[in-house]
Every structure is written in structure tokens, then in C-alpha cells.
Curated annotation (Swiss-Prot):
Localization per Swiss-Prot or TrEMBL: Cell inner membrane
Transmembrane helix found in the keyword field: yes
EC number(s) stated in the UniProt entry for this protein: 3.6.1.27
Keywords, alphabetical: Antibiotic resistance, Cell inner membrane, Cell membrane, Cell shape, Cell wall biogenesis/degradation, Hydrolase, Membrane, Peptidoglycan synthesis, Transmembrane, Transmembrane helix
Gene giving rise to this polypeptide: uppP
Protein name from the UniProt record: Undecaprenyl-diphosphatase
Amino acid sequence: MLLADTWYPNWWQALILGMVQGITEFLPISSTAHLRVFPALVGWPDAGASFTAVIQLGSLGAVLIYFASDLRQLILGSWKAWRERDFQQEPWRLSVGILVGTVPIVVAGWAIKAIWGSPPRQLWVIATAAIGLAVLLGWAEQTGKRQRDLHSLGIWDGIWVGLAQALSLIPGVSRSGSTLTAGLFLHLQRSAAARYSFLLGIPALFLAGVVEFISEFEAEALLPQGLGTLSAFVFSYLSIDWLIQFLQRSSTWLFIVYRIGFGLFIILGLALGFLRP
């Protein structure tokens, strides 16, 4: 059950939080961080990790629809590879890479929930993570050769990107940011790294949303969760489409600079007192 002091946003607050979730989930800037900082700026309570995880199901729905064709090819191609016992086929390698790449975040998420209940959401943690990942993304942007596409990916690539995805349990890191960074380090093209990040995120988003919805179920939360999820779906779809097109023609430096500025803004807010830890 939810804690007695859990805050439930009203209908328009839920729509706004869903919009924030949708816009920021797939951009490498951390949706969790923005869902923590935005309410603090406008004077709302923190909706909590459970609300954040549940409305991510809207982002999941957007991925499933946007990449429906890719997913259909992966499923049918993997089934064909299984029947033919040809495990070098591309759909099989991609599918297995996604599955094994999900293991690290599942294990880490279970451990965090068992030990601490939820990840830390203090603003100083978010600021540190935002700047730290920006440095890594900048390094990857500079050193990555960007020669590989999705056709070259194998199971080991899924493992490495999956390990990076587990770091996103730290608020401020960003799941898309950590996986995009890992993809660039593996010399993927920017748009290919983003597409793989989206596909890899499907199991993680599903498991996080369903687990939190079931374990923290409260009838009073259904309306805000539903509205937030719907809003997140719409804005996630638009965000995915924009990012794929953006990375086909531009670098990630826009997000690197934004992350550093975002982290410094939080630090300034904490120092001046207009943000509470």
C-alpha cells in the first residue's frame, strides 16, 4: 500500500507531469530528474518513484506503436531462426541482446527495492548524476567512430548497453542517456544507438511500471496515474520521432550542454534555497 502522506496530483497536474515524463523519457536528460525538479520549482510535492514508474507505461505504449514494424520483424525473425537453429541471424542476435541486456537493471532494481525501498531522489544526487553522465556522453561523442548500424549488433553489445542501462536507476543519469552513451562508445551511429536504446528499454519500462502499479496499488491513485500515463504516451511518441530525426543530422552536444546547465541550476537552487533537497 502507499504511504499515508503520499501526494496525489489532481487531473491537470497529472497531465502536466505526464507531459514532462513524455518529453524527457527518451531524450538523454532524465525523466526522473525532471519529474523530481519540476514539482519542486512550482511548489508541488514529489509524486514519488511509484507514480513515475507507472506513468512510464505511457512511454512504453509509444515505443511499442512507433517501433511496431521493427518489433514484428524481430519476433518473426527470431522464431524463424529458432526453427532453423540458425542463431547467427540478425533478429535472433538483436532479440537475445535485448533480453540479456535487461537482466542487469532487473537485478539492480530488485536489490535497490529490497534494501532501500526506492532509489535516492535527493536533488544533490540528481545534479551530480546529470553532470557526470554529461561528461561521459561528451567523451563518447568525441571518441565514438559512429561506423556501426543495428545490423552489426550482437549479444555482447546488448550486455554492455544493458549494464549501462542499470546505471539509470540513479535519478539524473537517464536510461536513454546511459544507453545512448554506451552505444556511442561501441561505435554505433547516433540514430542506431537511439533506436537500440528504445528497443532495449521496452522490457525495463514494462517491468518497472507493472511492478510498481501492483505493489503500490491504491484506488485513489488510479485517475492521476491514468491521466499521467495517457499524457506521457502522446508526448513520448512525439519525442521519439523528433529525437530519431534530430540524431540523423546532429550530434548530442545539445543534450550534453543542457545536462550540465541543468545540474548547475539544481546546485544553485540548493545553495540559494529556492530548491529543497
